[in-house]
Amino acid sequence: MKLYASEIRVGMLIEYKNDLWQVLKTQHVKPGKGGAFAQVEMKSVNKNTKLNERFRSSESVEKASLDETKFNYLYSDEIDYYFMDPKSYEQINIKKETIGEKGKMLTENLEVSISFYNEKPLTVELPNQVTCTVDTTDVALKGQTVSSSYKPATLDNGVNIQVPPFIESGDKIIVDTRTMEYVKKI
C-alpha cells in the first residue's frame, strides 16, 4: 500500500531501498521557502542500522503488508520462545532478543499476536494487561501516606516494578505490558 510522506507515523513498517524499516521518529516541516517535507528516522529490521531520510510531501513510500496471527505461548529455553497456533497446532520459535524485556511477562498459554512479513515472524504483541503475583516487596511504614509514594516490588517472573504501599507479598496484581507499570490489585 502506497503512503504519502505526510502519512508516515512512528511505529509503522515501510519498504524502502530494498529493505524493511521501522519508523522511529517523524517530523513534518514546512519551510518558508520551498516545499514541505517529512524528516524520518528509521531503523532497519534486518540489518539493525539507522537511517535519516527526507521525503518530499509528494513522494510516496510502500507500507509493509504484515500478516497478523494469534498464537499461544508454550515455553522458552536459553535462546528462543516457543508459540503454538491454536487452530493448526503449528509451533514456531522466536529468538529472545526479538521480544526483549517484555518476554518476561509471558505466561503459559498467554494469547499473543505475532506479525509476519514474508512468512517470517517479525513482532510479538502481548496483551495490554497481564496478571502477575508479587513475589517480594518492602513493608510499608506508617506515616508514609502523606504523598503518593510507591515502593519497589519483585514479581514472580523476576520483573521489578513500583507498587502502592498497600500491596504485600503474595498479592495478585495487573501490570500494563506497554509501560511495565502497576495498574490495579485483584
Swiss-Prot record:
Q: Which GO BP terms, alphabetically?
A: peptide biosynthetic process
Q: Which pathway is recorded for this entry?
A: Protein biosynthesis; polypeptide chain elongation
Q: Name one GO molecular function term.
A: translation elongation factor activity
GO CC terms, sorted: cytoplasm
**Sorted alphabetically, which keywords does the UniProt record give?**
Cytoplasm, Elongation factor, Protein biosynthesis
Query: What SUPFAM superfamilies does the entry give?
Result: Nucleic acid-binding proteins, Translation proteins SH3-like domain
SMART domains, per database record: EFP, Elong-fact-P_C
Q: What is its main location?
A: cytoplasm
Does Nucleotide-binding show up as a keyword for this record?
no
Q: Which Pfam families match?
A: EFP, EFP_N, Elong-fact-P_C
Function description: Involved in peptide bond synthesis. Stimulates efficient translation and peptide-bond synthesis on native or reconstituted 70S ribosomes in vitro. Probably functions indirectly by altering the affinity of the ribosome for aminoacyl-tRNA, thus increasing their reactivity as acceptors for peptidyl transferase.
Please state which protein family the record places this protein in: Belongs to the elongation factor P family.
User: What is this protein identified as?
Assistant: Elongation factor P
Q: Which organism is it from?
A: Pelagibacter ubique (strain HTCC1062)
